[in-house]
Every structure is written in C-alpha cells, then in structure tokens.
C-alpha cells in the first residue's frame, strides 16, 4: 500500500471519529430502547437529530460530546506541539476542561438535563491532580474515554513502534486504570492495522493474537465472535453505560457488521446508551478501512468544527512518525 493511501486512511480515522461523535450527540445517553426506537423509527437519517433526545444535557447541535471533545483536545495538542509531550498535553487538557471553562459548571444527576456540556466525574477528580503535575493523575476506574479519545494519537504514530507507550501516558492522565489502558492499546493497535493495511477481514484476529491470553482478551474476543447478535441486543447485553468492558464490547460488535461508514454510525446511535463514545471508536475503525471519501461532506459541514478538524487532520498526516 502506498504512503498516500496510508495517509488518507489516517486522516479519515481522525475525521471519521469526530464527525461520528457530533452526529450521535443528540441521541447520546438514551438508555430506554423503546423510547429511542419510537423517536427514530421513521427517521432514515437520525444523525444530527434536530430533536434533542439526550436526557443528561442540552448543547448546540454539531458540537462534540465529552468524548469527542477530549479527542479534539488531543488532536489540537499534537498539531500545535508537532507531536506528543506529556507535560504540555496535561496543561492543554487542564486549560480546556478546568476552572473557568464551559465545563466547569455545577451538574447533578438530580437536576437533569443540564444546560451546556457534560464533564464526567472522573475527569473532575483528575483535574486536581493534573494541576499538581502528577503524571498519573487519573482516577482508578475503567471507562470508555480511554479508547474514544485517542484516534489522533494513533493516526500520528501508526507504524512507529511507539504507540503503546504514548497510549499509556495519555490514558493515565485521566484514567489511571489497567483495564482502561489495555483497552485503549487494543483499540489503537486495531486502528493502526487498518490505517497501515486497509480493509482486512482477519484484522481483528491478527491484532488480537499479539495480546496475552487474559480476561481482557477474552472479553474482546467474546464480543467480536457474537456477530450473529444484532447491535441493539449486544448493547443491551453488555450494558448501556460508559464503563469497560461493556461499552467497548458494544463497539466491537458493531465492527463485525461489515457496514459502510454511514451505516455503522447509524447502527451505533440506534443502539442507545453511551453511544457517542462507541461512535468515536466505530467511526475511526470504519473510516480507516474505507478512506476519507466514505465520510459524507454534509456530515462534516454539520459538525461545527468540521473544517478545523479537516485542517488539523491534514497537518497530522504531514507529521506522521513512521
């Protein structure tokens, strides 16, 4: 495969992840499958829904969820710094999500929906340690942010041999938890495979074979091999929430559908729960296989920072560390 094809797939992964997140956010966190099905039943194009169904918060259509926003912060850091620097990344993260920002607003599950963006509790706890300079400032919980936010890092360092180390550093800033790190590393290695090699029906098993035979691996394999189960049922089985392994298992099940980019994202959003995080992952995996042409231009234009993401992604591929 030519270097230009690899670069196009890396760019597609970045854009595909963030656009999928924005497209999904209006239906994020709907955990009642009957309600979601009723609302979307007659909508052949549920993306960027003008009817905001998200029960936790209200925000502008076309913006990113907390998962996409972390993804964007990492993307911007990599471009501005011309690569990853842990201290500078921690500073950028704190400035974006910390005191005085739109994310620094009172929120309570007793008073929903919140007006404005949502900040996950483990991020709030991690911010205090980030300020102190603790490089493993994250909370010891297994959450889907770990894989949903790292696509730009994979795109820049695909094929470099440095990916595992960088993923470990990035994830532990907010999630100092082994399952979070290992899940992110597997997500990254599978995405790296698609970026470097394109579509490969055996890609999952090839990447999985390089991981130790432990419970993490068994969880991923179980989800992938239950391909006869539709994604709605898989998400119901593995859980609607943001915790791991369930959220990641729901994303893996969607990958087995072998659908195109648009169909994959729509399948994800129709399955409910913490769908924005799953869309970040599925959007990256599928876009990396099909290339940048698979992402609809009108989806990019409906993403409020879509043009900015395109420009940042173009800069990333010029700096790929292969």
Swiss-Prot record:
Expressed in the rhopalia. Present in both the large and small eyes. Transmembrane segments: none annotated. Pfam families: ADP_ribosyl_GH. One of its GO terms (molecular function) is structural constituent of eye lens. Keywords: Eye lens protein. It comes from the Eukaryota. Coiled coil: none annotated. PANTHER family: ADP-RIBOSYLGLYCOHYDROLASE, SELENOPROTEIN J. Belongs to the ADP-ribosylglycohydrolase family. J1 crystallin subfamily. This is Crystallin J1B.
